[in-house]
Amino acid sequence: MNQTPDFIIFAQHGWADTHHAIAALAKNLATPQSHLVTPNLGWLKTWWRIEPLIQHVERVATETITQYPDTPIRIIGHSMGGLIWLEILNQHPEWWYQIESFVLVASPIGGADLARLIDPFSVGIGMAGALGINRRQIAQSIAKKIPTLVIAGDRDRGSDGTIIVESTKFSGAKFVSIPNLAHAQLKNHPTVIGIIREFWANPTITNPYPLDFTAQLIERLQSIPGMTDAHPRDFPRSQPYITLANGFTIRIWTSPLHVDHIFVANPEGECLYSGFVGWRHRGALHQVLAEIGNQ
């Protein structure tokens, strides 16, 4: 008779990848009695559509949870792997009570900027259509019920070289940024292992902090249809568009492709947020900016 595991650990790889690195991460974190589940989606299949990948992981998860209905669950998702699990958990709230923790490593919850540039009209070009979706509302709902940790790498003061740091954040999750780690390194790195292990020692729900002025302004901009978090590297190119009474400024830079990039700066001129909207949502952006300017 098989011994019941003390934990089920689901660890899911992401786009343009296989399971090997994140399986090693899970093995490093596991107790001797843990049951590891690390589905290999296949490198090539991760380039096409996300729906079959979600269905694959969902089938494996259903079989595992049916086999061990009372075993606590720990979930780790790297990059697109985190997005896959967001979609699965959104479809299966009946599993939430069993999940002890949810760890998202370098997952573009707000939408990947590279994906939005590839698929600016959201028509579903390959995997870009799925990676460019803003899933913050889903993530925030889950984080209210499941202890959630977000880990991001910051190698160039804004991204891990692939995923924008700001795109990984959402209200209700514990957030940890690791300097000088690239996207691929985050799949299995001693620092990441240490952070997850510390979180697992005391997994608790993170109560959202009251929104200050800056957070409210950024949240309002992020709520604009089509707004995608962007790297702040183009901040020096921007010009003040709205100067608020408290000295904060909203700045704009229009790229050579006529894409509007928006920035929020404090009175000291430091960039606090950067994002962009495509041609399709330019009108919505300027409508909100007009409302902010008239307040």
Indicate residue ranges for each PLM-predicted region.
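Extended non-globular C-terminal regions
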Residues: P210-Q295
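Active-site-adjacent alpha-helix of alpha/beta-hydrolase-fold enzymes
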Residues: V150-A152, R157-A184
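A short, charged/proline- and glycine-enriched loop
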Residues: Q3-F7
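Serine-dependent carboxylesterase/thioesterase catalytic core
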Residues: I9-W15, H19-H20, L29-A30, H35-I151, ...
